[in-house]
Design a protein with these regions (language model features):
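Hydrophobic alpha-helical signal peptides and transmembrane signal-/tail-anchor segments
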Residues: 212-213
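… and, occasionally, acidic/histidine-rich disordered N-termini of signaling adaptors
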Residues: 12-200
Length: 214
């Protein structure tokens, strides 16, 4: 390297290093936000076992799940994935969580709640940003889960006898369409659960990992 080239080389190197450090800091912030807003404990329901886990990849996205106690042996259950990565996805995840916690006790129809979330998200989110989500209300006394699927991965139900089924209910992602189209394109469904049945909700991290290894 010629000496006269050094001044041009050093600033570029420093700029690249600063950019890398900034991205690392953003990743740490996004991971901290994600951990903070995931449930730290799960309220117990009589006769129902509930568990959740989130293991972030190297690049934190907008994966989100929640369990919100509604009293009377009922619980609101949500799982979603905000498009994008990093701080922006984490920010919109906090927005979604805030809306769900504000409305879950007031709106007992999962479809209508998602419709309101869709309206608020479209009004506040950057154009092109969306959320895939399953939101439902689990009534332990009835062993019923009434839910709506807004463009999210289909729920997997494994029955006690070993039979399995994918619940491919129709639905449009939150933030994709206006309220009229969202309501027309999304349906509410009630799943009847028997003793020993298992319902599995997940984000696309599971499917991406499956394709990566297999």
């Amino acid at each position: 390297m010629r000496k006269k080239d050094l001044p041009d080389y050093v600033p570029t190197y420093i700029e690249d290093q600063a950019k890398e450090q900034r991205l690392d800091q953003e990743l740490e912030i996004a991971q901290a936000v994600q951990k903070t807003f995931l449930p730290s404990r799960v309220e117990k329901l009589t006769g129902i076992d509930i568990a959740g886990i989130c293991e972030p990849a190297q690049e934190t996205g907008g994966d989100y799940y929640d369990m919100i106690s509604l009293g009377k042996n009922r619980m609101a259950i949500a799982i979603g994935d905000v498009s994008g990565k990093g701080i922006q996805a984490a920010f919109y995840m906090t927005f979604v969580k805030g809306v769900l916690h504000s409305l879950s006790a007031l709106i007992l129809s999962p479809l209508e709640l998602l419709n309101q979330l869709n309206r608020l998200f479209k009004e506040n989110a950057t154009r092109g940003t969306f959320v895939s989500m399953i939101y439902g209300i689990l009534e332990a006394d009835k062993r019923e889960l009434t839910f709506a699927r807004a463009g999210h991965n289909p729920m997997l139900v494994v029955r006690a006898n070993g039979d399995a089924e994918w619940l491919m209910t129709k639905g449009i992602g939150v933030g994709v369409a206006n309220s009229l189209l969202f309501m027309k394109g999304t349906e509410e469904y009630t799943l009847k659960l028997n003793e020993g049945d298992v319902a599995v909700l997940y984000t696309d991290g599971i499917t991406e990992m499956f394709f990566f290894f297999f």
